[in-house]
């Protein structure tokens, strides 16, 4: 377990991703460095009204403290009171073009230490894609990149983390997946630190290859008010998921995290309307019937 | 304790409020009646793209069941497994004009029964106002109507329920009140059923007088893109409160309530932007400095 090594990787990952996205967009991200009064801090990189990205944030944070609050360890009461350290990179990008999907990626590391005891640590992370208008080839490309990221660690990871992603990014109050999925994992600490770190690093390292080709392909497709309107409506689901179900968002907001960094994930313009659904057979209906179905995008086995 | 009497009152209240609002707006509400598979149902009255109201809903629901789930009674474990019955009217109105405030009102009744035991019951409710551009006279008018509603039940209620409202409608992650407050109460079952019912009824009955004069005064004020933009930004706070902190919304969504009726409270068009605050001294800044301060709008005592 080497925390400094993980932190260095995360700082570098954030820089590489922001630089890569700036090359695509042509507009620079704003960079805000902030301190956490209780220990640690972070850097939030934000783009708004870019050429391609309507709103997006790539956030790095590294927080630590002396006594882990009981609320943070409900599932592991034996960790209460331990010193802790957590670091991660988290991003959400909302392109302007309704044919380009929203994307989310996160890699994170947590460690709880106590003198005279073995440190307890785990990795978590993943990435998932949320289209407004679905393209089968985009979904396949994204899942292939997820699989490529995990394959070096072992055959078993992609199917397991793909399923975990479908289960996690699910709006129970809508009985609806958030998007076409990807991969998600948490509590990863087996078989050893090096294997877990390599796997997590590979997920972060594959992000640009997973997303940028899709963004490039869709960024300049012509669209009109109808598509923008549907995008704004569907973005409401993103808000609902993040504020009602996402554990990271809720924990951050309820535990005094930096609100503006946490809510960078929310879309720039959102609409709600009552009991609306798209006309059967329309391109909008196709999103529900063909894409928000938890299907397998890659041939299994 | 007479449940039928409460239910009749609530059905009538919904009708009176919807009729009153239709007279103001000139457009009819859509009325949807729905059943709850586990027992009960409701009527949702919705307006969208009205002449004055951009989006609004007035919801009546009456639900019952045989065994109260433990999750619903965390604070009162002795009620688990009892038969229960709950009814309420809940409304949120989002006017189009940014000078007209958003308003919320709710009155509700809950009863848990068991053969051979005294029924356990309580009332809850209140109303609160959320301006985008504040007007002192509107805040005073609204609070005066709240006080008028409670005064017949006793001097002590308005100050107590005003404070409770300020505490409840508070965005902890923003350190910011949702609006200029009003009144809020819950668990009301003293001194007796008749007193509690009268008080709750008076709150419901005062809603139109509390809000309609404000709406009429502001509905036709001239505004431009700047004011609409600030309104959309501030509406984001409404979404954040309702999805992150509001117990009724969260419980409804997480317990299989009717999603479209619960989320009628969300605004039609919402914007999020990073780390934004209004220029010092601007009309937008005045909202924060002069109105979102938990102040007393009526002379005390």
Swiss-Prot record, chains A, B:
PROSITE patterns reported in the protein's UniProt record: COPROGEN_OXIDASE
Alphabetized UniProt keyword annotations: Cytoplasm, Heme biosynthesis, Metal-binding, Oxidoreductase, Porphyrin biosynthesis
Domain of life: Bacteria
Active site (catalytic residues): 104 (proton donor)
Binding of a divalent metal cation, residues: 94, 104, 143, 173
Binding residue positions for substrate: 90, 106-108, 256-258
Pathway, per record: Porphyrin-containing compound metabolism; protoporphyrin-IX biosynthesis; protoporphyrinogen-IX from coproporphyrinogen-III (O2 route): step 1/1
Catalytic activity field: coproporphyrinogen III + O2 + 2 H(+) = protoporphyrinogen IX + 2 CO2 + 2 H2O
Subcellular location, record wording: Cytoplasm
Any one of the GO BP annotations: protoporphyrinogen IX biosynthetic process
One GO cellular component term: cytoplasm
Important for dimerization as annotated region, ranges: 238-273
Residues the record marks as site: Important for dimerization: 173
GO-annotated molecular function: coproporphyrinogen oxidase activity; metal ion binding; protein homodimerization activity
Pfam annotation, one family: Coprogen_oxidas
Cross-referenced InterPro entries: Coprogen_oxidase_aer, Coprogen_oxidase_aer_sf, Coprogen_oxidase_CS
EC number: 1.3.3.3
Catalytic EC class: oxidoreductase
HAMAP family named among the record's database cross-references: Coprogen_oxidas (MF_00333)
Function field: Involved in the heme biosynthesis. Catalyzes the aerobic oxidative decarboxylation of propionate groups of rings A and B of coproporphyrinogen-III to yield the vinyl groups in protoporphyrinogen-IX.
NCBIfam families documented for this protein: PRK05330.1
Binding partners and assembly: Homodimer.
Family recorded in the similarity comment: Belongs to the aerobic coproporphyrinogen-III oxidase family.
Protein name as annotated: Oxygen-dependent coproporphyrinogen-III oxidase
Native source organism of the sequence: Nitrosomonas europaea (strain ATCC 19718 / CIP 103999 / KCTC 2705 / NBRC 14298)
Gene that this polypeptide is encoded by: hemF
